[in-house]
């Protein structure tokens, strides 16, 4: 029979790589605990309508990239392509943002998009999401940016990432700007790239995000979104930049930053790097003050961001910021297979009393000679021998594997004290 292989665009995390994920996840939790955000765990399957109403029917994600299917009841379901919509659904369904309540939440888990697989872009990818609800002022904008900045500093990569900012204004501002942009682009229709021509009808603002040099030259003299934004929102954006200056967070303004999801309003931002080739964005977010109401909840201020975990790990690896994994155990037990009922009880007692120790043994229980060979390869500092003689005399044999010391004997009731030293 032919060998089965993994689905294209999906990845296994092998045992030798899992420590990298554990390290990153521990840093994430450390930072988010510091800001008093609470973890939530969301289903990976949602009703398709949720993403049609939030991400947008015309977005690339919904129109080209979602994994959709019908269950046995005929309901249309989707593997989540992003986390914000599901988080908003949870907040509404559980009345977490009613009567002036505020919520500061985070989640981390797999998302699914049918995209062309390449370095840093997979069809199943892990995303950290940070979301805050019920906060109107600038302070929350600064806090979510500071969370990402703190994480990058904790990981030692802050000098390799750049914060880019823009303001999308209100929905009315964007409608007025969209009409002005379409009017400007009319004479250039034949010169636009294929994707931009498609976006003219579906989502004209996404043309600003084009990476095609010819299109960017056409856009150089196009109307600017900032000129269509209300005075109050423009002032808020200016104040946000001033506060970031005071916090020492480096940033640059990017008037073409529009984001690929329809729910964003006001402030939008991305953290980018030049170390990952074309996949330069490692974190992106912004305000989405209308989404809770659009999905059936009360009018609620909201802001959040997402970090692509695989891309972040790639950046950490490329910059040499991940320590080598230490697979060595601390103690290796060498046991007599004929007396396991006694010796295994001793080992398990030590595991319970000293949970910080990494303890291993040869579960095939070969000859003592073969067990000693495995002990030498294990990286353990000591081997503890429990054979028939040791059990008869009440003493375990202690062999030091990394030091030139003579073998010792330690009474079984003193083993824990010995290993604590």
UniProtKB/Swiss-Prot annotation:
The keyword Cytoplasm applies. Keywords: Aminoacyl-tRNA synthetase, ATP-binding, Cytoplasm, Ligase, Nucleotide-binding, Protein biosynthesis. GO terms for molecular function: ATP binding; histidine-tRNA ligase activity. CDD domains: HisRS-like_core. Its main location: cytoplasm. Its EC number is 6.1.1.21. It is found in: Cytoplasm. The keyword DNA damage does not apply. GO terms for biological process: histidyl-tRNA aminoacylation. It catalyses: tRNA(His) + L-histidine + ATP = L-histidyl-tRNA(His) + AMP + diphosphate + H(+). GO terms for cellular component: cytoplasm. Belongs to the class-II aminoacyl-tRNA synthetase family. Homodimer. This is Histidine--tRNA ligase. It comes from Francisella tularensis subsp. mediasiatica (strain FSC147).
